[in-house]
């Protein structure tokens, strides 16, 4: 008689969330959330996200700099076929901030409504659902 093995479910890997405290600060006092830039204490280069060591001088000490909440849409793409957990259609874009940084982010609003050079502002919202259908919250930008 052959030995029967119990049906074992494969272990579920933990889901990856897009929210990370090194990227986004939501102040407890109710002030508006902001993205965190990192300025190298050695050479002054500002980056988002944090790049360690500093790509300019190899410095390893940084200060957190709150980034502007507003910027200009440099480029964007409307997506009609998405990855698992993302409701289609949706848009992504590159946003130029006054600090001379270019940020990649999901855009909040109807695809087809965006134009290059649109003024946009930081917001927080659902970027997708995890495998369990739980919304994952992170930063996005929307037209002003």
Swiss-Prot record:
Induction: Induced by toluene.
Catalytic activity from the UniProt record: (S)-2-benzoylsuccinyl-CoA + CoA = benzoyl-CoA + succinyl-CoA
Pathway: Xenobiotic degradation; toluene degradation
Keywords: Acyltransferase, Aromatic hydrocarbons catabolism, Metal-binding, Transferase, Zinc
Keyword hit for Zinc: yes
Summary of pH dependence: Optimum pH is 6.4 (for benzoylsuccinyl-CoA formation).
Protein's GO biological process: catabolic process
GO MF entry, a single one: acyltransferase activity
Residues engaged in binding Zn(2+): 40, 43, 54, 57
Top enzyme class: transferase
Subunit structure, as described in the record: Heterotetramer composed of two BbsA subunits and two BbsB subunits. BbsA forms homodimeric subcomplexes. Both BbsA and BbsB are essential for enzymatic activity.
Family: Belongs to the BbsA family.
Function statement: Component of the BbsAB thiolase complex, which catalyzes the thiolytic cleavage of (S)-2-benzoylsuccinyl-CoA to succinyl-CoA and benzoyl-CoA, the final step of anaerobic toluene metabolism. The BbsA subunit critically contributes to an induced-fit process for productive binding of a CoA substrate into the active site of BbsB.
The protein, known as: Benzoylsuccinyl-CoA thiolase subunit BbsA
Organism annotation: Thauera aromatica
Gene: bbsA
């Amino acid at each position: 008689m052959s030995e029967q093995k119990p049906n074992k479910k494969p272990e579920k890997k933990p889901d990856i969330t897009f929210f990370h405290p090194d990227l986004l600060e939501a102040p407890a006092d109710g002030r508006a959330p902001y993205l965190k830039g990192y300025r190298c204490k050695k050479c002054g280069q500002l980056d988002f996200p944090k790049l360690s060591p500093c790509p300019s001088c190899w410095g390893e000490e940084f200060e957190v700099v709150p980034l502007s909440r507003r910027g200009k849409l440099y480029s964007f793409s409307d997506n009609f076929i998405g990855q698992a957990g993302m409701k289609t259609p949706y848009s992504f874009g590159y946003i130029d901030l006054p600090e001379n940084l270019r940020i990649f982010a999901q855009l909040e609003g109807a695809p087809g409504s965006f134009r290059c050079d649109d003024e946009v502002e930081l917001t927080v919202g659902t970027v997708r659902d995890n495998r369990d259908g739980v919304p994952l919250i992170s930063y996005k930008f929307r037209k002003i």
